């Protein structure tokens, strides 16, 4: 894999197709912007030659976004000669090193990597072994497989997983429900303001496989009082948004509130 280092006009850079990692606002982006302002872009982005003199970003989408917002015209880049599948693997591996990743990001990243490595003639076992080594010793092949299951969730349910309203393991169970039943479940979750526990999700899956899952069944399951249910204090984002910078995410606001309460 040959590579060269050069400065590239930022207008010639295009995002990676179907990039599974979402744009990040908030504290992390602000810190990156401050670093670029003081020191310039210290770490080159990684790209590959594309069409008509353009370059596809493999690693460094957030850095490019910050540089654009700051009016920087050129960025240092490592230009690598890569196939599409090689580019997918590098893109996924470099982004999996981020400190904070949403379950949906991991899910679609693993799926993309699995498909790319299959194109290279590698087995599933080789794929998950490499993925595990690139993340941590705790990320087993079985866990990677669970993450990929999340790609079968409809967007409404996957959003609840990212927001930590539905826990990871129950979400895996719900991913086996057909799309029409998932849509009904999402509506009932909104109506009851309750999400299924692991045991409830397992029952919903079982009822579905038996052809016994209905709106009434879903409502009855979600309406059950959970043994470990605790009283919660909830705020509407719109009610507290005015007290925080516009760039703050919901997680940033939560961390700030907890920090202030600890000092109270």
What are the functions of these language-model segments?
Residues 112-114, 141-255:
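Amphipathic alpha-helical extensions and coiled-coil-like segments
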Residues 1-80, 86-99:
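Short, charged/polar connector segments at secondary-structure boundaries
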Residues 21-23, 29, 65-152, 159-162, ...:
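Amphipathic, charge-rich alpha-helical segments that serve as recognition/docking helices
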Residues 63, 85, 106-107, 167-171, ...:
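Short runs of predominantly hydrophobic/aromatic residues within well-ordered alpha helices
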Residues 8-11, 39, 48, 115, ...:
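Compositionally biased, intrinsically disordered low-complexity segments
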Residues 254-264:
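Low-complexity, acidic/Ser/Thr- and charged residue-rich accessory regions of DNA metabolism proteins
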Residues 41-43, 97, 120, 126, ...:
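Glutamine-centric residue-chemistry signal
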